Structures are given as C-alpha cells and as structure tokens.
From Swiss-Prot:
Lineage: Bacteria, Pseudomonadati, Pseudomonadota, Gammaproteobacteria, Pseudomonadales
Keyword flag Transmembrane helix: no
Chain's gene name: groES
A Pfam family that the UniProt record links to this protein: Cpn10
SUPFAM superfamilies to which the protein is assigned, alphabetical: GroES-like (SSF50129)
Gene Ontology molecular function terms on file: ATP binding; metal ion binding; protein folding chaperone; protein-folding chaperone binding; unfolded protein binding
The protein's name: Co-chaperonin GroES
C-alpha cells in the first residue's frame, strides 16, 4: 500500500532496536529502549501558511532522521509493518553520511 500523508506530516520506519549494549550485554526486549531514529518513507505536500501558501517540507523520502523519545505517538500498520506518523516539527535532525 502506498501512503501520502497530509500537509506537514511524515511517515517514518523506525530503525531496528539495539539489543546489545556497547559492553556486549544482551538486553531483553522490555529493557531495550525504542530507537529515536528512522527512515522517512512518505512525506506530505507541506505546511499551509496563514496566507494560504504551502511551504514544502525540509525532509524527503529516504532521509535518515532523529526524533524525540515521545515523538510519533501515532503508529499505523501497513502491510504488516508498524510505521510512525508525526509532524515535521517533531523531527530534530537529518543524519547526513
């Protein structure tokens, strides 16, 4: 299924959870923190400004992004995969290689 979020919303696939610490300790699923990184899989058309103009989003499909621990509280299931839906303003940064 193909998604097209509305306005300034972004759909993100969360990165895989870290199940091992830097010291090599394996964490059980309940102790592992949900990652706050992901890949943008769909973007809306942009934010509608007060004057009616549409400001395009600064992120694009394929961008690796960092977001807050409480961002993306809206999850949807698409083709068996959990995806996050959040506003562009909930994204802190784009990870550049």
């Amino acid at each position: 299924m193909k998604l097209r979020p509305l306005h300034d919303r972004v759909v993100i696939r969360r990165s895989e959870e870290e199940t091992k610490t830097a010291g090599g300790i394996v964490l059980p699923g309940s102790a592992a923190e949900k990652p706050n990184r992901g890949e943008v899989v769909a973007v809306g058309t942009g934010r509608v400004l007060d004057n009616g103009e549409v400001r395009p989003l600064a992120v694009k499909v394929g961008d690796k992004v960092v977001f807050g621990p409480y961002s993306g509280s809206n999850t949807i299931k698409v083709d068996g995969e959990d995806l996050l839906v959040m506003g562009e303003n909930e994204i802190f940064a784009v990870v550049e290689a």
